[in-house]
């Protein structure tokens, strides 16, 4: 799976925060159907990645701290610790015994080209566009 449940939950949290207001974890969990324990884990990552700001106390809550137009799906996946790798052999430092024995691997070359296109596509989609659907939510041709 390229986009994990964790990144899906992160997108849902960001969707709640689109309004620019502070929201409690309980509110976001209830609205977006995210288990509380996962919401806290995800918010820690989003905060560490400077995508959200979390404040504690009576007036605390969570709010956006990034520009969603300048932040891509690729960026979010990186914050969540995902690389969206198509195949294990795309991982840096992967040792392929087949390639060691036979040389160039056509499968790897084709997958590398697909990986590059996927990464470019994920970099081209801003989180705001993804979360709001842009001008026409049914039109995914430019995503």
Model-based region annotation:
Residues 37:
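Key DNA-contact positions within bacterial/archaeal DNA-binding proteins
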Residues 49-65:
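Beta-hairpin "wing" of winged helix-turn-helix
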Residues 3-34:
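N-terminal helix-turn-helix DNA-binding core of bacterial DNA-binding proteins
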Residues 65-143:
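Non-DNA-binding regulatory cores of transcription-related proteins
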Residues 28-30, 46, 76:
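Append "Primarily bacterial transcriptional regulators
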């Amino acid at each position: 799976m390229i986009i994990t449940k964790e990144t899906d939950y992160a997108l849902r949290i960001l969707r709640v925060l689109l309004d620019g207001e502070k929201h409690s974890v309980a509110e976001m969990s209830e609205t977006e159907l995210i288990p509380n324990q996962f919401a806290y884990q995800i918010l820690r990552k989003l905060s560490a990645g400077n995508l959200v700001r979390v404040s504690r106390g009576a007036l605390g809550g969570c709010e956006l701290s990034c520009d969603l137009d300048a932040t891509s799906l690729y960026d979010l996946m990186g914050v969540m610790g995902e690389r969206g790798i198509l195949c294990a052999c795309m991982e840096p430092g992967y040792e392929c015994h087949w390639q060691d024995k036979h040389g160039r691997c056509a499968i790897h070359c084709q997958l590398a080209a697909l990986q590059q296109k996927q990464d470019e596509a994920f970099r081209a989609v801003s989180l705001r566009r993804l979360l709001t659907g842009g001008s026409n939510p049914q039109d995914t041709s430019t995503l």
